[in-house]
């Protein structure tokens, strides 16, 4: 038997074996196939497809499957979709949709390149997580934004850009409040705040006043003037940092007296009002 004949025989045998396995797999696929509820795909189609995981599930498909199959999974967990998506999911699944409070990301740091002290010059990987592993990062303030844009790179909705001053800028019209940027920030500088809040503290420092002021010219120094001048009790001092109670600030405040009293300008007016529901 020549080499050519042997080669042909091998090809024929392998083809027959492959064909046999193909038939077996096709039969098994048809015999043991699990039917997927078509409603799952319908729900998935109305989700924003950001795959942000803010709902607590591993992507939009996973949430769609869970909300359709599991009666305990709420229809309003899609943060980017907000109230309109929650309403549609509720109608499709026959569940009650609770109100969704619209939120957007807010960077609690104003310490840009001109205002914050640098401890050293960083020449490593341009990533906030990587930079934070080296003595906490090059910024003197160990609580401030490092400015390498890890949040920008991870925003699934292109709602963030890096400014020339070394701080991220958030496009409030594009931001869905999914929290992806917050989850990747090693300094926990980004916070999700409700729309409609009147003021926000543009600082994340927990350092004492003298230290904070030395490291950044616009840091909160925990002096308490904002607290004393807030007539609604919406501000408190925690770990040398002013903290605003958003619920009180939204419902009670009509004039932000705390803004004028802040000696460093760490308290800032906020973004925009809550959009009217259709």
Indicate where each model-derived feature is located.
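Ferredoxin-type iron-sulfur electron-transfer modules and their immediate structural context
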Residues: 2-229, 249, 256-261, 265-278
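Strongly charged, low-complexity linkers/loops
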Residues: 225, 235-243
């Amino acid at each position: 038997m020549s080499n050519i004949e042997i080669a042909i025989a091998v090809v024929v045998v392998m083809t027959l074996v492959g064909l046999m396995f193909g038939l077996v797999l096709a039969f098994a696929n048809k015999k043991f196939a699990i039917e997927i509820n078509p409603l799952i795909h319908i729900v998935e189609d109305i989700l924003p497809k950001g795959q942000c995981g803010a709902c607590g599930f591993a992507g939009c498909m996973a949430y769609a499957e869970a909300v359709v199959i599991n009666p305990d999974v709420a229809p309003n967990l899609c943060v980017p979709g907000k109230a309109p998506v929650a309403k549609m999911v509720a109608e499709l699944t026959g569940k009650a949709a609770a109100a969704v409070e619209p939120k957007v990301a807010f960077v609690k740091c104003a310490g840009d390149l001109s205002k914050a002290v640098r401890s050293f010059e960083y020449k490593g990987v341009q990533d906030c997580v990587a930079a934070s592993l080296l003595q906490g990062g090059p910024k003197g303030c160990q609580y401030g934004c490092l400015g390498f844009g890890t949040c920008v790179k991870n925003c699934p909705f292109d709602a963030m850009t890096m400014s020339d001053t070394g701080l991220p800028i958030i496009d409030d019209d594009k931001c869905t409040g999914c929290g992806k940027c917050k989850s990747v920030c090693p300094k926990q500088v980004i916070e999700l705040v409700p729309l409609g809040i009147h003021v926000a503290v543009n600082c994340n420092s927990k350092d004492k006043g003298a230290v904070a002021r030395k490291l950044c010219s616009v840091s909160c120094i925990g002096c308490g003037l904002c607290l004393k001048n807030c007539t609604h009790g919406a501000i408190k001092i925690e770990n040398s940092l002013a903290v605003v109670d958003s619920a009180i600030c939204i419902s009670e405040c009509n004039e932000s007296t705390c803004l004028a009293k802040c000696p460093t300008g760490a308290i800032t007016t906020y973004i925009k009002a809550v959009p009217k529901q259709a």
